[in-house]
Regions:
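Hydrophobic or amphipathic, alpha-helical segments that drive membrane association/targeting
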Residues: 1-138, 173, 178-244, 248, ...
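C-terminal capping/extension segments of zinc metalloprotease domains
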Residues: 1-9, 252, 256-266, 270, ...
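Short pre-active-site segment immediately N-terminal to the catalytic Zn-binding motif
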Residues: 93-100, 149-162
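Active-site recognition of the HExxH zinc-binding catalytic motif
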Residues: 109, 147, 162-170, 174, ...
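Envelope-exposed proteins and targeting segments
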Residues: 121, 141-143, 287-289
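Membrane-embedded alpha-helical segments that form the functional core of polytopic membrane enzymes
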Residues: 145-152, 226
Length: 339
């Protein structure tokens, strides 16, 4: 398949998934507002009718809770890529005292900056043995690129070029900002669920004489829990699907930048053949899994919430002739202890 066609398809699928997420969130908020605004009709019948006064009170409250949770997450994520790199144990590669491997990495970053038309970002080195990298930041101006020691020690110059080109694609295509928007929305829904949990606990422990009021509090708490946690669950599923499409887009764009499909294909094959794979050991590695070149952590929910496509599928999209075997990769211990 033509790599420009792959880019077009990935962008189209991303747009559909983002639209689905927006519609899902709006529907969830609308249903929640309506559920709290239903009342019995005044004509003596048992039919339910919509109390518009209640809508005027409930709607701003529900929207306000979701927005508050989203804004708190925004404030946390806007700190820039530097904060994320440091949380993952990254070390800034300074102008002085670079090793030959570090200098080669900086040269490649500068080459890819020129190819993509983006300013040269700050570069961090992670001490991990796994072959991995990431781009983080809210805008190209505060973006950083992080690369593991395993990547710069094990990959050839061409393979490392493919990895860096992939990360520049994420910066160029605005994937960092897109991820931040989705994370903020999901966090807002999660806060709605947490608010429901608090109401449920308080209502169930209440000694109020009016049992109907107590029951109403319990029901409100249960409904908010279901709405918030279900919303964040399905939002996370959509976010993971969007992330997988952006990985395909970044792979295809990396080929465009390097003009060499085997550069990124070779790096992916080495990940498959390396004992450490693309593993990142930092305590908060899972929090930033969607940023990595390849999955950096593993969990029981991998298939459901996978932020990256299957390694073999990514390779076959680039190298249709691949026979399915991974090269055996050994990493010299002496190179891993430089940090």
């Amino acid at each position: 398949m033509n790599f420009f066609e792959q880019q077009r398809q990935a962008r189209h699928r991303t747009a559909l998934l983002v639209l689905l997420m927006i519609l899902s969130v709006l529907s969830l908020i609308t249903i929640t507002c309506l559920a709290f605004s239903l009342d019995h009709a005044n004509d003596g019948s048992r039919r339910l009718t919509l109390n518009w006064q209640a809508v005027g009170v409930v709607a701003p409250l529900i929207i306000g809770v979701v927005l508050l949770g989203s804004l708190v997450k925004y404030a946390e994520l806007r700190a820039g890529g530097k904060v994320i790199a440091e949380k993952l144990g990254g070390r800034l590669i300074n102008h002085g005292g670079r090793t030959l491997e570090e200098q080669r990495l900086i040269n490649i970053v500068e080459e890819m900056a020129l190819a993509s038309g983006i300013a040269v970002p700050t570069v961090y080195l992670l001490p991990d043995e796994g072959i991995n990298a990431f781009a983080a930041g809210f805008t190209p101006e505060d973006a950083v690129i992080g690369v593991t020691q395993g990547a710069i020690s094990l990959l050839t110059r061409e393979e490392l070029q493919g990895v860096i080109a992939h990360e520049f694609s994420h910066i160029y295509n605005g994937d960092m900002r897109l991820n931040m928007h989705m994370l903020a929305i999901i966090s807002g829904l999660l806060v709605l669920g947490l608010a429901g949990s608090l109401i449920l606990v308080k209502a169930s422990q209440s000694n109020h004489r009016d049992q109907r009021l107590k029951l109403a509090g319990v029901l409100i708490g249960i409904f908010l829990c279901i709405a918030g946690f279900a919303g964040s669950f399905f939002g996370s599923l959509i976010k993971a699907a969007v992330s997988r499409q952006r990985e395909f887009l970044a792979d295809a764009t990396a080929v465009q930048y390097t003009r060499n499909p085997q550069s990124i294909a070779g790096a992916l094959k080495k990940i498959g053949g390396h004992a450490q794979g693309s593993h990142i050991k930092a305590a908060r590695a899972g929090e930033f899994s969607h940023l990595y070149f390849n999955t950096g952590v593993s969990s029981a929910m991998d298939r459901l919430f996978a932020t990256h496509p299957d390694l073999s599928e990514r390779i076959r999209r680039i190298d249709a002739q691949w026979d399915g075997t991974f090269p055996h990769v050994e990493i010299p211990r002496s190179q891993l202890k430089r940090n």
